[in-house]
């Protein structure tokens, strides 16, 4: 899952080997939530990308556009009579990391104050888990890691959401997530307490994600 690190940008399909498919998560839709995208991608919206390449691409995507500066207000929706009602996919569209903390993120009434990060893996690995809990040390590929916002950085919980990463939020009522720009911190890879990387992309010293 990913988001653009600018206000708006076309997806750079030619930058990386293979043919990509980009879909947008639509909480309001009843059925397959992953809807085809057309035109420019928007800030703070979560997207899904797949690539038909048989080997892992080594190139870097380049997004051009105006940077997001200042606080962000992100709409969270809760649509009745749809599947996965209240499940919203939000992206970090800043060029710095968002701390998983109550100082950095203010949740609306009705929102679960927990950030869900998708662990390294494929959709097929997620499907085969079929929503089951994993009662073992470590995290399985295709599993979500739930991080309570008041526990970010404690024990084995990561403390930040790097630029371009997307994360799931659950809410029982529509409202607005507020992100405090002054609390942003440096990008790093998202790791467990033991240093093991737990999400799909890592950030290098030049703020590139791969």
Question: PLM features: residue spans?
Answer:
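N-terminal exported-region signature
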Residues: 1-184, 191
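Extended terminal and domain-junction accessory segments
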Residues: 180-210
């Amino acid at each position: 899952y990913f988001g653009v690190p600018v206000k708006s940008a076309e997806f750079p399909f030619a930058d990386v080997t293979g043919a990509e498919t980009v879909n947008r998560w639509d909480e309001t839709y009843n059925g397959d939530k992953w809807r085809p995208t057309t035109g420019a991608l928007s800030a703070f919206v979560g997207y899904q990308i797949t690539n038909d390449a048989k080997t892992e691409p080594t190139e870097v995507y380049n997004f051009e556009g105006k940077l997001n500066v200042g606080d962000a207000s992100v709409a969270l929706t809760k649509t009745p009579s749809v599947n996965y009602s209240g499940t919203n996919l939000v992206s970090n569209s800043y060029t710095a990391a968002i701390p998983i903390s109550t100082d950095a993120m203010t949740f609306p009434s009705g929102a679960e104050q927990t950030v869900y990060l998708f662990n390294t893996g494929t959709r097929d690995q997620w499907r085969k888990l079929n929503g089951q809990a994993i009662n073992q040390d470590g995290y399985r590929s295709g599993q979500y890691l739930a991080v309570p916002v008041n526990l970010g950085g404690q024990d084995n919980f990561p403390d930040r959401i790097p630029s371009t990463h997307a994360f799931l939020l659950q809410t029982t009522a529509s409202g607005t997530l507020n992100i405090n720009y002054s609390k942003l911190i440096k990008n790093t890879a998202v790791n467990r307490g033991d240093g093991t990387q737990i999400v799909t992309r890592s950030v290098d010293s030049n703020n590139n994600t791969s």
